[in-house]
Amino acid sequence: MKLTFLGHAVLLISDIEGKYNVIIDPFITGNPAYPKDFQLPKIDYIMVTHGHGDHLGDTVELCKKYNSTVISNFEICNYLQLKGCKIHPMHVGGVYYFEFGKVKLTPAIHGSGIHEGDKVLYGGNPCGFLIKVEGKNIYHAGDTGLTKEFELLKDIDVAFLPIGGNFVMDVEDALVALEMIKPKIVVPIHYNTWDIIKADEQKFKEGAEKLGIKCVILKPGESLEI
């Protein structure tokens, strides 16, 4: 399996043989960190952690282009269904087995309002995703602050954690989270997209390695194969 970081919090999970492509939080248009020359493959599933524009992103456009199915909370799925998207609604704590693997929605401490014109629509509860694919456990935390809920996560092969501060955990809090999660590998996300979430990824890497956890810093467009 190949895990490709596409800037900000965008993650593409792909089967090496091309059997499936799953994208999380597809913020492409307007994302200054998105690799402009990257050729996105046909997307089978879109997973959305919450309703903010930098995560909901290009979901509707991708759905219409690829006939993708959206996996998200009940409220976001209902909103997207009205936009013509195929949906699979879930909620925090829920588990479902898809053709590509097992998905569980995990708690996240954040907001989820959907901005539409001059209105903010209710977007349900934000979440993270715990995904079991090809025998590997992948955790995408979404946008979240530090929470004791991290202690419930076990046997994580790769964790994608936000470190940018201001809206989410900063480096120090992300290291506390890392100590609770204890993944085999951690990849920092949601940082340096804009100055307001500027963070020192090398400081995070050094802290992770002191905990005995491998930290892989991916530039937008780079992949990790597991």
Swiss-Prot record:
Q: Which InterPro entries match?
A: Metallo-B-lactamas, RibonucZ/Hydroxyglut_hydro, UPF0173, UPF0173_UPF0282_UlaG_hydrolase
The record's section on Gene3D superfamilies has:
Ribonuclease Z/Hydroxyacylglutathione hydrolase-like
An MF annotation (GO) of this entry: hydrolase activity
Which of UniProt's keywords are assigned here? Hydrolase
Respond yes or no to whether keyword Hydrolase is given for this record. yes
At the top level of its lineage, which domain of life is listed?
Bacteria
Family, per the entry? Answer: Belongs to the UPF0173 family.
Q: Which HAMAP family match?
A: UPF0173 (MF_00457)
Name the UniProt record assigns to this protein = UPF0173 metal-dependent hydrolase Fnod_0635
Q: Provide the species name.
A: Fervidobacterium nodosum (strain ATCC 35602 / DSM 5306 / Rt17-B1)
